[in-house]
């Protein structure tokens, strides 16, 4: 049953997210706008939608939980909050992320979303927390009609979105891609340019061993990485961040490298 749910995961997310808004929830103008943007994103599968959903949905659910705790905990309030929390949990599953990134694929591409590098997790959470705080305070300012505070917050929110939204979206554009010509690592966070492995140069693709000496492009994230072994040496051009994390030069010649996907490409 669980596997069947994940196979058609888009519909449970949509239904639960709509049910989440059907009962009294204390939403103001800002919260309703955020809810609507997320709702639209659940119907339009795309990497941009994935970024939008995963950034905004937690804020809406948090606001609903706070409202429910401040009111009498009726069975209806508990049911509504539960719908929101379950929907949010499904939005952060590997299957849901894969559905969005695959929807933007070209032709015969098969995209496998990469896990977020461990050193980037904390800065990402801090950035999101600042963004979420501004949104929550803006919601309270609008509800209390405190426009003296609300207008500067709105301007700050626009500036933060302009600055940080592209950085957050980069995490939804990191893929291992299977194409007719072979495999491509599309990761502008750790790589300066895409890494193409043609089929004739591929020796093996399998789970990495613990003592593997392959170049680690997984970003030291959790889980067992995938090792891609090559017949001939190939150039890997690292971004400034990638070179800094690996403590090496920005151009390397390698015969094997590691990546960490949210779903295995070995099936």
Annotate each language-model stretch with its function.
Residues 62-69, 90, 229-267:
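Terminal and domain-flanking low-complexity segments
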Residues 29-37, 77-87, 149-158:
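Hydrophobic core segments of alpha-helical transmembrane domains in multi-pass membrane proteins
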Residues 103-177:
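Anionic N-terminal interaction surfaces
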Residues 173-188, 195:
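Polybasic phosphoinositide-binding surfaces of eukaryotic membrane-targeting domains
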Residues 213-238:
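Short, surface-exposed polybasic-and-hydrophobic patches located at secondary-structure transitions
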Residues 183-185, 194-212:
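Phosphoinositide-dependent membrane-docking surfaces
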Residues 1-8, 42, 74-134:
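N-terminal membrane-targeting/pre-transmembrane regions
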Residues 1-73:
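Membrane-anchoring hydrophobic segments
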């Amino acid at each position: 049953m669980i596997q069947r749910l994940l196979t058609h995961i888009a519909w449970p997310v949509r239904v639960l997210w709509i049910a989440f808004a059907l009962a009294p929830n204390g939403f103001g103008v800002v919260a309703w706008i955020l809810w609507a943007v997320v709702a639209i994103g659940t119907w339009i599968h795309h990497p941009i939608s994935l970024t939008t959903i995963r950034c905004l949905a937690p804020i809406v659910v948090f606001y609903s939980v706070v409202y429910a705790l401040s009111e009498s905990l009726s069975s209806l309030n508990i049911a509504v909050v539960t719908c929101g929390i379950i929907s949010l949990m499904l939005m952060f599953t590997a299957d849901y992320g894969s559905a969005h990134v695959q929807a933007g694929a070209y032709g015969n591409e098969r995209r496998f979303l990469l896990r977020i590098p461990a050193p980037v997790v904390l800065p990402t959470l801090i950035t999101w927390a600042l963004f979420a705080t501004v949104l929550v305070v803006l919601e309270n300012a609008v509800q209390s009609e405190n426009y003296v505070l609300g207008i500067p917050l709105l301007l700050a929110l626009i500036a933060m979105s302009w600055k940080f939204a592209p950085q957050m979206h980069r995490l939804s554009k990191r893929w291992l891609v299977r194409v007719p010509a072979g495999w491509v690592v599309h990761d502008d966070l750790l790589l300066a340019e895409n890494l193409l492995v043609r089929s004739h140069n591929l020796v093996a693709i399998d789970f990495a061993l613990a003592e593997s000496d392959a170049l680690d492009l997984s970003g030291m994230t959790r889980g067992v990485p995938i090792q891609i072994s090559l017949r001939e040496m190939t150039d890997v051009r690292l971004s400034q961040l990638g070179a800094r994390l690996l403590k090496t030069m920005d151009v390397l010649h390698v015969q094997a490298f590691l990546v960490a996907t949210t779903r295995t490409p070995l099936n």
